[in-house]
């Protein structure tokens, strides 16, 4: 187990050293977009929408954007960064000559992508607290929700990257899966309730669960209940890594 953890740390460190050269652009890119949405939609529509759940629309939107920033950063790193290292630049293929297991390498990649998501989500949370849309104390309490979302979507995007034959699939994945999930999970508008089947499915969406939990913390001051969900996310990530490792090994050995 110790050797495996050393591998995870080595992959994480390698990515961190590479990321350090482009850290400013990466962080700004992950943070500016949700802040633009916050001002554009939150302040703009806030003049039209009186309130949502008893709060201003900007406050309602801020809670969701914290988590979508974590989701987007994790997705982007996994879909483009990890995919390139596996299939384009040959990083993984080169590392396989060393005594390294593909699944251990992928765990390191998932941890790195999740870390980027946590960084992006935390920065957006701090910015929204500074602007007065969420209480400053709540930033600490919503960190588990940010980590939960980052883990779930980094491991999901790993499987998408593993099966993809090119970058074109990523745009399809974003359009057919991520965008509807954002709109239906209560990020921009209250949760969709127009159809019982769809509403029931959204109720179990990880993004909806996390957004709902963050709003409970921010609105009511209740402690986060994300502990069991974090354990579930670790189990889910393990399954995604196992499946992705099988797919990648087959493709690299062709």
UniProtKB/Swiss-Prot annotation:
Keywords for the protein's UniProt record, in alphabetical order: Cell inner membrane, Cell membrane, Membrane, Nodulation, Transmembrane, Transmembrane helix, Transport
CC per GO annotation: ATP-binding cassette (ABC) transporter complex
One Pfam short name: ABC2_membrane
Any one Gene Ontology BP term: oligosaccharide transport
PROSITE patterns: ABC_TM2 (PS51012)
Domain ABC transmembrane type-2 residue range list: 25-251
Record localization: Cell inner membrane
Stretch forming the signal peptide: none
Topology of the protein relative to the lipid bilayer: Multi-pass membrane protein
Top-rank lineage group of the source organism: Bacteria
Molecular function GO labels: ABC-type transporter activity
Primary role: Part of the ABC transporter complex NodIJ involved in the export of the nodulation factors (Nod factors), the bacterial signal molecules that induce symbiosis and subsequent nodulation induction. Nod factors are LCO (lipo-chitin oligosaccharide), a modified beta-1,4-linked N-acetylglucosamine oligosaccharide. This subunit encodes the transporter.
UniProt family annotation: Belongs to the ABC-2 integral membrane protein family. Lipooligosaccharide exporter (TC 3.A.1.102) subfamily.
Quaternary structure note: The complex is composed of two ATP-binding proteins (NodI) and two transmembrane proteins (NodJ).
Protein name: Nodulation protein J
UniProt source species: Azorhizobium caulinodans (strain ATCC 43989 / DSM 5975 / JCM 20966 / LMG 6465 / NBRC 14845 / NCIMB 13405 / ORS 571)
């Amino acid at each position: 187990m110790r050797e495996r953890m050393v591998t995870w740390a080595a992959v994480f460190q390698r990515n961190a050293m590479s990321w350090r050269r482009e850290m400013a652009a990466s962080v700004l890119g992950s943070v500016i977009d949700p802040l633009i949405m916050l001002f554009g939609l939150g302040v703009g529509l806030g003049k039209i929408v009186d309130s949502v759940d008893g709060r201003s629309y900007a406050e309602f939107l801020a809670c969701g954007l914290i988590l979508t920033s974590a989701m987007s950063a994790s997705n982007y790193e996994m879909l483009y960064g990890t995919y390139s290292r596996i299939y384009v630049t040959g990083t993984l293929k080169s590392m396989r000559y060393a005594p390294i297991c593909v699944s251990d390498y992928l765990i390191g990649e998932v941890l790195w992508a999740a870390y980027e998501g946590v960084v992006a989500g935390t920065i957006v949370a701090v910015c929204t607290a500074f602007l007065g849309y969420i209480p400053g104390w709540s930033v600490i309490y919503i960190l588990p929700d940010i980590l939960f979302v980052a883990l779930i979507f980094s491991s999901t995007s790993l499987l998408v990257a593993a099966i993809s034959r090119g970058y074109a699939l990523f745009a399809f994945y974003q359009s057919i899966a991520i965008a509807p999930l954002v709109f239906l999970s209560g990020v921009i508008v209250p949760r969709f309730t127009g159809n019982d089947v769809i509403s029931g499915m959204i109720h179990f969406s990880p993004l909806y669960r996390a957004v709902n939990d963050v709003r409970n913390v921010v609105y009511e001051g209740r402690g986060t209940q994300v502990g069991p969900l974090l354990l579930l996310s670790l189990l889910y990530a393990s399954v995604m890594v196992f499946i992705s490792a099988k797919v990648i090994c087959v493709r690299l050995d062709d």
